[in-house]
Amino acid sequence: MTKHIVLSSLLLIALAIFGGCRTVPYDTSGQNFAVFQFGEFRMLVNTTAPLTFLAAQKAVQQDDLFKTYEVQNKFEAQILARAHNDQKIRINIEEANSRQTLVRIRWGEGGDQIKSRKLFDMIDANLK
């Protein structure tokens, strides 16, 4: 009986640690990768947080999302929005260093990799 408990516990711990993380190839060259972990899409952009925030605001409008909340500080920002099917979208922007900013997108409660990536692509296009 104790072997089953130990084995079950180890299995649950392994699933919690390794189960929710995927590296997603971002481009066809294989040089850039994004991370989709526990329903959250993460990718770096080569610019500052304020410029990324402006690009994210524009992407929210382009994707016809209803913005419910936004806040911006010097090195970080957050935008909350809703889709037409009432799914909650959260965009977190954090400046990693003076030349790179981390963008984290969660689409819905469980996360949607395809829709999150589409929104990130719009943000990235607005930065160019």
Q: Locations of the language-model features?
A:
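Ser/Thr-rich, low-complexity intrinsically disordered terminal regions
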Residues: 22-128
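C-terminal motif of bacterial Sec signal peptides marking the signal peptidase cleavage site
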Residues: 16-20
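Repetitive helical segments and hydrophobic/amphipathic motifs
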Residues: 12-13
